[in-house]
Amino acid sequence: MNVIETRALGKSYGSTRALRDCTLAIPDGHVVALVGPNGAGKSTFLNLAVGLATPSAGEVTVLGGLAAGSLPALDGIAFVAQDTPLFKNLSAADLIHMTRNLNLRFDQGYAEHRLGELGIDLEQKAGKMSGGQQAQLALTLALARRPQLLVLDEPMAMLDPLARHDFMATVMTAVADDGVSVVLSSHVLAELERVADYLVLVSRGRVQVAGEVNDLLATHRVLTGPAAQAGRHLQHWDVVHASCAAPLAEVLVRGYATCEPMPPGWDAHSLTLEELTLAYLREPDAAALPGPARTHSPGTKERTK
């Protein structure tokens, strides 16, 4: 089952195209890192998936084919946004009561127990809580709905490192205990690397990279060798990003197997998710998507083989 699937999805705000020609299938059972620069279309994509916006073109379905925003879809998805929208004048107990009345599957016992573990007073008003406590309260209310899919849009942006760690610990406990699928948008790449097993990179309103992290890392390598020899090799490699400053060239390639045997004086090194992501962000015309292989050299348009 795909928890989110899009076909030629697009969204425009007036003359501004926030998302264009997005075709993507995210399978269930993953913690998905949704990354990209500011204004790339990440929040637009998530808003379309959870039914807070309607497409200008194409379609989006969730949880195995349900129309995004439909009542069955809303019943199976929980969403936490960056600003942790809580009624600041209501206590945690009030918010639990309100959320329970709006959601038939709401697990009040879980919510109260979880907040107790976190040391959050049920009688304290949300507006009097720290940023970390507010984020944990919003996350607890979302998880108590017992969703199949948890969507998180920059929920840790305003949190300190300890609060971010505690927030992600709660998320990963839900993944381990309940099998929740997660789509998490964040700018903190090192943090995502510890938890994500699926990557979706959005750039300039389109999906640039999508796939399981292990597969992406296995098919990409950083090649290093004499800068003077780089030019003769680049045309034969599927190059994502190249830095050829003398004396040593550093080239990130896709389809590493096609580069073997390595030329004399060249070595191949594995890379991290952060290095992979940054390389594609530096080369927005490069892509790594399921389907036909694409070739690209920095400064040129990609082409499909």
Give the positions of each predicted feature.
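Catalytic Walker B motif of ABC-type/P-loop ATPase nucleotide-binding domains
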Residues: 150-154, 159
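Conserved structural motif at the start of ABC-family nucleotide-binding domains
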Residues: 4, 19-21
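Conserved ABC transporter NBD signature motif
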Residues: 57-73
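ABC-family P-loop ATPase nucleotide-binding domains
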Residues: 81-137
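Helix-to-loop junction immediately C-terminal to a conserved catalytic motif
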Residues: 50
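ABC transporter nucleotide-binding domain
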Residues: 167-254
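The feature captures the beta-strand-to-loop junction immediately N-terminal to the Walker
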Residues: 35-37
